[in-house]
Amino acid sequence: MIFTAXDRSAIEXV
């Protein structure tokens, strides 16, 4: 799970 701007907008692996 990778959070870019603290949001769940840019999550990889999910």
Curated annotation (Swiss-Prot):
Keyword Nuclease recorded: no
Please, which domain of life does this record's source organism belong to?
Answer: Eukaryota
State its location(s): Microsome; Endoplasmic reticulum
Q: Per the record, GO CC terms?
A: endoplasmic reticulum; intracellular membrane-bounded organelle
Reply yes or no: does the keyword Endoplasmic reticulum apply: yes
Assigned keywords, A-Z: Endoplasmic reticulum, Microsome
Put simply, this protein is called 13.2 kDa protein
Taxonomic source organism: Scyliorhinus canicula
